[in-house]
Swiss-Prot record:
Transmembrane segments: none
GO MF: actin monomer binding
Function of the molecule: Plays an important role in the organization of the cytoskeleton. Binds to and sequesters actin monomers (G actin) and therefore inhibits actin polymerization.
Name of the protein described by the UniProt record: Thymosin beta-10
Record family assignment: Belongs to the thymosin beta family.
Matching PANTHER family: THYMOSIN BETA, THYMOSIN BETA-10
Source organism: Torpedo marmorata
């Protein structure tokens, strides 16, 4: 059936074909305090 995964392709995967990438700095979520300050600034 088509809904069963084909693990043969995964087992024969060549890791050397992957490209090395530099990780970028992630955007962190604002803290609760920052959100509260922005809400107060918008309402006034």
């Amino acid at each position: 059936m088509a809904d069963k995964p084909d693990f043969g392709e995964v087992a024969s995967f060549d890791k050397s074909k992957l490209k090395k990438t530099d990780t970028e700095v992630k955007n962190t979520l604002p803290t609760k305090e920052t959100i509260d300050q922005e809400k107060k600034a918008e309402s006034s």
